[in-house]
Curated annotation (Swiss-Prot):
This is Chaperone protein DnaJ. The lineage of its organism: Bacteria, Pseudomonadati, Aquificota, Aquificia, Aquificales. The keyword Repeat applies. It comes from Hydrogenobacter thermophilus (strain DSM 6534 / IAM 12695 / TK-6). HAMAP family: DnaJ (MF_01152). Belongs to the DnaJ family. The keyword DNA-binding does not apply.
């Protein structure tokens, strides 16, 4: 590897002071900055100028380089360059004439659904904030023809020296461009993007479950410099249901039946998740707390549907008139209950037997 003459690249003598080296670097970096210079080889020259300054601006690196330059030892020079390669790689980044397009950021939101909406699918309107290209300047950051002035922070070099190693980094003021746009767009303050309140209708597929993430491509933040937009991610959260409790793909519910139906048996109608009614036959002597499983009426999940498990509760009348009281007293006698003279106590006991 031939030894480069970094003093010659910067146009300074080998005994130049640190201030002279810095001054030469700023002048050349400004002249050959890829965003300013019309020279077709500006990027390579700018890269070489930064490499030279990186080595000569540090006292220890300059001392080692001077030793190698004096001896002409190309092997030592190659080892020296490999040693500082990590530093140089960070300099080469971002020195292209046209920065790469940058994909927009993703937007992540919580989507609350009822059990019915998630089970059978629906359409939901989503409101959220996202960054889009400024409609005033069409994402350029300026209106009309660009008017630019030299960045005062880096003096047009696009780089600023910072850190204990005097390492040149992209200027944070001008973002490494070496200039500042004078006629910035007033609508976006030169950013080229503005926040917009968006309204989007999304399709929720049937069988959506708690924790599922729905992806809407291209509905995140708009990209920069022509980059593609980010995506919108919606994490599903199921609202508590007043009737059904979901456990996996099964649904659980409680159904209240009358005392005569529990004793005599018969059919009752159960409202399903769809909103339709399903007839259920009860055997005579159905006890409070007994369950019945209806296959295929649970929650729809990919590959099948769960079951509906019903727990029956016996509904006890709260307002007992004289006719009902007489019937219960007669029932108590038939069942062999003692202490009929304590009518209130017996009635209370019978009613308590019907409860949980």
């Amino acid at each position: 590897m031939p030894i480069k003459d970094y003093y010659q690249i910067l146009g300074v003598s080998k005994d130049a002071t640190a201030e002279e080296i810095k001054k030469a670097y700023r002048r050349l970096a400004k002249e050959y900055h890829p965003d300013i210079s019309a020279d077709e080889n500006a990027s390579e020259k700018f890269k070489e100028i930064n490499e030279a300054y990186h080595i000569l601006s540090d006292e220890e690196r300059r001392k080692e380089y001077d030793r190698i330059l004096k001896s002409g030892d190309e092997k030592s020079y190659r080892d020296f360059m490999e040693y500082i390669q990590d530093f140089l790689e960070s300099i080469w980044q971002g020195m292209r004439r046209s920065p790469k397009p940058k994909k927009g950021g993703d937007v992540r939101l919580k989507l609350e659904l009822t059990l019915e909406e998630a089970a059978f699918g629906c359409e939901k309107d989503i409101e959220y904030e996202r960054w889009i290209d400024c409609p005033t300047c069409e994402g350029k950051g300026y209106v009309g023809k660009m008017e630019k002035v030299t960045c005062h922070a880096c003096e047009g070099t696009g780089r600023r020296v910072s850190g204990i190693f005097s390492f040149p980094r992209p200027c944070s003021v001008c973002k490494g461009r070496g200039f500042i746009i004078k006629n910035q767009c007033p609508a976006c303050s030169g950013r080229g993007r503005v926040a917009m309140h968006s309204l989007l209708r999304v399709n929720v597929p049937p069988g959506t479950d708690e924790g599922d993430v729905l992806k809407v491509p291209g509905k995140g933040h708009t990209g920069e410099r022509g980059g593609e937009a980010g995506d919108l991610y919606l994490r599903v959260s199921l609202k508590p249901h007043p009737i059904f409790k979901k456990v996996g793909k099964d649904l659980y519910m409680e159904a209240f039946i009358s005392f005569p139906l529990a004793v005599l048996g018969g059919t009752t109608k159960i409202k399903t998740l769809e909103g339709s009614y399903q007839e259920v036959f009860l055997q005579p002597g159905t006890e409070c707390g007994s369950t019945k499983r209806l296959q295929g009426l649970g929650y729809p999940i990919a590959g099948g549907r769960g079951d509906l498990i019903i727990t029956f509760r016996i509904e006890v009348p709260k307002n007992v008139n004289s006719n009902i009281r007489a019937l219960i007293e007669k029932l108590a006698k038939e069942l062999g209950e003692e202490g009929i003279e304590y009518q209130s106590g017996v009635i209370t006991k019978i009613l308590s037997l019907l409860k949980l």
